[in-house]
Amino acid sequence: MKKQDISVKTVVAIGIGAAVFVILGRFVVIPTGFPNTNIETSYAFLALISAIFGPFAGLMTGLIGHAIKDFTTYGSAWWSWVICSGIIGCLYGWIGLKLNLSSGRFSRKSMIYFNTGQIIANIICWALIAPTLDILIYNEPANKVYTQGVISAVLNIISVGIIGTILLKAYASSQIKKGSLRKE
């Protein structure tokens, strides 16, 4: 079995990605009026980092970024949601493996694939796993946490669907397309 090393580029991406995740999570959110539930731009950025650098980078960026954001905002981390940020980053990374953004192409078919995957991933993470962990870890009332989870899932689907798709398209457009250079 071949040992896979983590590249310096991936470690740097995790560090920078986590820092940007914290900044977006602290300062670029839109309150919804429902407790501890916001429209988050950080998950669209997490989708970009995960799609470019893979599932491990997405996992670590989500875990580290969310934990630091919680510690700097509330004084402690809400671990059930920190774990889910890592899971969603990993899932975005798996979705991104098929996108091949470095080829310079992000077609309509790729957009549909990405958005179908992120919808399923957000529902699983935020509407199912996060509330269940809230109940198991913190003994929170089920009706409250499942309501928060569904609202968060819907808001993240919208945020990642719009902002994340724009970021992925912009990144792919910045890459040199294979076969685009010609000898004169």
Curated annotation (Swiss-Prot):
Subcellular location(s) of the protein: Cell membrane
NCBIfam families linked: PRK13661.1
Main location per the UniProt record: membrane
Topological relation to the membrane, as annotated: Multi-pass membrane protein
Membrane-traversing stretches: 11-31, 44-64, 77-97, 117-137, 148-168
PANTHER family membership: UPF0397 PROTEIN BC_2624-RELATED (PTHR37815), UPF0397 PROTEIN SPR0429 (PTHR37815:SF3)
Gene Ontology CC annotations of this record: plasma membrane
Protein name: UPF0397 protein SAR2767
Keyword tags: Cell membrane, Membrane, Transmembrane, Transmembrane helix
Keyword Mitochondrion: no
Homology family: Belongs to the UPF0397 family.
